[in-house]
């Protein structure tokens, strides 16, 4: 039986989602828990592998089990055992051919920034602090330029190993908040550090160091040296995972280009 688990976590005290030889990770917490229940190792398969310090409002993973335990009991047992910075929101059964990674057709990230004259220790780890004034309207116009299908070679980590760096963004916008702004981006998928590089670039636009018209040229150049900065992990949230193609079409229209992970 294949089980799908929806979770949320605060990333401050994790080295990321993926298991590491030394250090606390989200995958480690769940596989340790499942091993106690099954008396053997059980591997989990996530929809996304968030980096160190990145939070998740909605994340999924699946695992296979031969235990006949009601779904409500799975959720209760997990939440009773897990630490305070992880929570299981839902547990359901899925078809045996379902795969969390390959059936994911889209993801939405939110990057949170607060602006003030001085740093707020109660925001630390949850939002990124920027004291300088920023031109949010200009940043939003630049953000809109990323919507569509592009090669994001110049906007991801040079450690990115995937061959194709073409991704489709359905949403890319700056939203003003009471204490700063959020950058919201939804796409078919994201490259290593891509969202944090986009945020860092948009902040440079807001400071007047780049123009809106630079975006097409930087995309075409495919050179990371032209966009050298990466925003901190602390303000980044994995906000939504799209496992249903119809949900993505409902949010962004029937004319969008749908990608499946096996085609990326």
UniProtKB/Swiss-Prot annotation:
tRNA processing recorded as keyword: yes
Active site residues per record: 51
Swiss-Prot/TrEMBL keywords: Isomerase, tRNA processing
Pfam families per UniProt: PseudoU_synth_1
SUPFAM superfamilies named in the record: Pseudouridine synthase (SSF55120)
Origin superkingdom: Bacteria
GO molecular function: RNA binding; tRNA pseudouridine(38-40) synthase activity
Amino acids binding substrate: 109
Protein family per UniProt: Belongs to the tRNA pseudouridine synthase TruA family.
Classification via PANTHER family: PSEUDOURIDYLATE SYNTHASE, TRNA PSEUDOURIDINE SYNTHASE-LIKE 1
Function of the protein: Formation of pseudouridine at positions 38, 39 and 40 in the anticodon stem and loop of transfer RNAs.
Name listed for the protein in its UniProt record: tRNA pseudouridine synthase A
Organism: Staphylococcus aureus (strain MRSA252)
Gene: truA
């Amino acid at each position: 039986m294949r089980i799908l688990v929806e979770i949320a976590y605060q990333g401050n005290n994790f080295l990321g989602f993926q298991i590491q030889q030394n250090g606390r990770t989200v995958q480690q917490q769940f596989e340790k828990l499942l091993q106690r229940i099954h008396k053997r190792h059980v591997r989990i398969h996530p929809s996304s592998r968030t980096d160190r310090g990145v939070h998740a409002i909605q994340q999924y993973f699946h695992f296979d089990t031969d235990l006949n335990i009601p779904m409500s009991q799975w959720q209760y047992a997990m939440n009773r055992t897990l630490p305070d910075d992880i929570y299981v929101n839902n547990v359901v059964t899925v078809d045996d051919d379902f795969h969390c990674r390959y059936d994911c057709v889209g993801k939405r990230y939110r990057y949170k920034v607060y602006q003030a004259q001085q740093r707020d220790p109660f925001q630390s780890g949850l939002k990124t602090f920027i004291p300088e004034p920023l031109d949010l309207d200009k940043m939003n116009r630049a953000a809109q330029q990323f919507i569509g299908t592009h090669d994001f070679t110049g906007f991801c980590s040079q450690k990115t190993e995937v061959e194709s760096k073409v991704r489709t963004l359905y949403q890319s916008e700056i939203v003003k908040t009471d204490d700063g702004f959020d950058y919201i981006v939804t796409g078919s998928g994201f490259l290593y550090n891509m969202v944090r590089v986009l945020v860092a670039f948009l902040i440079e636009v807001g400071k007047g160091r780049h123009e809106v018209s630079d975006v097409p040229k930087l995309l075409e150049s495919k050179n990371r040296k032209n966009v050298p900065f990466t925003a901190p992990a602390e303000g980044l949230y994995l906000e939504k995972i799209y496992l249903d193609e119809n949900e993505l079409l409902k949010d962004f229209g029937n004319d969008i280009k749908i990608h499946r992970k096996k085609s990326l």
